[in-house]
Swiss-Prot record:
InterPro entries: Ribosomal_bL9, Ribosomal_bL9/RNase_H1_N, Ribosomal_bL9_bac/chp, Ribosomal_bL9_C, Ribosomal_bL9_C_sf, Ribosomal_bL9_N, Ribosomal_bL9_N_sf. This is Large ribosomal subunit protein bL9. SUPFAM superfamilies: L9 N-domain-like (SSF55658), Ribosomal protein L9 C-domain (SSF55653). GO terms for cellular component: ribonucleoprotein complex; ribosome.
Amino acid sequence: MKVIFLADVKGKGKKGEIKEVPTGYAQNFLIKKNLAKEATSQSIGELKGKQKAEEKAQAEILAEAQAVKAVLDEDKTRVQFQEKVGPDGRTFGSITAKKISEELQKQFGVKVDKRHIVLDHPIRAIGLFEVPVKLHKELTAEIKLAITEA
């Protein structure tokens, strides 16, 4: 019997896959537990429609990420920070991913989620820095930071 998997089933198939499985296994286990449904022409059509919609959504997300990357790659896109500095040259506050995200939104109107900014530890020094940001699973960019003394 041909079934469409509604969830990942270890050793049998992944969500969205159409596979031939034994009839008893399909009726008594997969369909009863809502792990799969019978592959009729209507359900196959629905699945293809969902996959097309998902691809379209992914393409839109990628295009949006590329637009953000284009803005971040411009030379004039440099996020400015003014921090108080102690006698040892270290800042009193630290620059975190959250602060970078907020300033990017405030200064350039570019919205980047703080979880996508790859910052090993908060920045506590003055100077110029480049911080990588993961905009999409296949697209990364660099945020340029200029931290000056207040």
